[in-house]
């Protein structure tokens, strides 16, 4: 097997990924066709092997564990005192209704707290309890701004959700498999939907059985939440709006 391809088990997606040694491509999720090709090549080039045995090996410690977020962030150069304030530069890409320096500083402060909490959620067992919301008219690239927050290496872990009416099993699993979940047009959410989102944001873990899995798993809550809308007064909860940063 090692002579044919490299393998890794994605701790977030719970999928085995493959990188063929005779192809000019990187790692990608393994497909049924990949398994069939491996089995065929092994039987042609070496000695006969049962297909069931191949699957047992690919599901064992033979395949090393890979955490995409830890691999990315721990591979970055360490920020040093005197380096550019990249979060401040990012904050300046957002046009504020209030152009005063005080409003700009407040937004930069909130953005920094939210981003730090998001990265902490990627690397530790901490959970980001706040939801950053961009409010403005349609067509000004609010959702696009959130989409490009994740670097290209992690962009597959961004999910845009435009129907928040039901927090079902798949949505809960997303909290363990996505890095950033964007709630589009949050103004359409009812009070019940807002309560569901607030409860989901604070969950420390996700306990669900994934499709085709035999048992339930306790998985860390990885995802941070963000949202977009076109009305400032989108919340009607009189008990407080602590989780939202509009």
Write out the residue ranges for each language-model feature.
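N-terminal nucleic-acid engagement/recognition segments and initiation subdomains in replication
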Residues: 1-85, 89, 96, 101-106
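Alpha-helical scaffold elements adjacent to nucleotide-binding pockets in ATP/GTP-utilizing enzyme cores
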Residues: 145-148, 192-200, 243
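P-loop NTPase catalytic core of nucleic-acid-dependent motor ATPases
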Residues: 60-177
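Conserved catalytic/switch belt of AAA+ P-loop NTPases
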Residues: 194-217
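Conserved ATPase-coupling elements of RecA-like P-loop NTPase cores
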Residues: 189-195, 237-238
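A short helix-turn-beta junction within AAA+ P-loop NTPase domains corresponding to the substrate/partner-engaging
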Residues: 235-246
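AAA+/SF3 P-loop NTPase mechanochemical coupling elements
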Residues: 171-176, 210-228
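Walker B catalytic acidic pair
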Residues: 184-186
């Amino acid at each position: 097997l090692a002579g044919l391809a490299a393998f890794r088990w994605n701790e977030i997606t719970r999928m085995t990924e493959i990188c063929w040694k005779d192809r000019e491509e990187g790692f990608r999720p393994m497909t049924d066709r990949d398994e069939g090709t491996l089995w065929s090549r092994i039987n042609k080039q070496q000695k006969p092997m049962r297909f069931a045995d191949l699957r047992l090996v690919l599901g064992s410690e033979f395949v090393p564990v890979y955490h995409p977020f830890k691999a990315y962030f721990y591979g970055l150069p360490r920020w040093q005192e005197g380096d550019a304030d990249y979060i401040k530069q990012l904050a300046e890409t957002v046009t504020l209704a209030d152009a005063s320096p005080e409003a700009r500083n407040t937004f930069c402060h909130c953005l920094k707290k939210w981003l730090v909490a998001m990265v902490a959620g990627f690397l530790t067992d901490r959970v980001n309890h706040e939801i950053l919301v961009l409010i403005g008219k349609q067509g000004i690239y609010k959702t696009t701004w959130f989409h490009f927050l994740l670097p290209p290496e992690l962009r597959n872990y961004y999910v845009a959700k435009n129907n928040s009416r039901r927090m079902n099993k798949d949505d809960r699993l997303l909290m363990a498999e996505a890095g950033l979940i964007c709630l589009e047009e949050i103004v359409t959410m009812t009070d019940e939907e807002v309560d569901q989102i607030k409860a989901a944001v604070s969950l420390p873990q996700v306990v669900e059985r994934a499709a085709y899995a035999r048992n339930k798993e306790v998985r860390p809550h990885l995802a941070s939440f963000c949202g977009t809308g076109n009305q400032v007064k989108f919340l009607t909860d009189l008990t407080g709006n602590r989780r939202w940063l509009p």
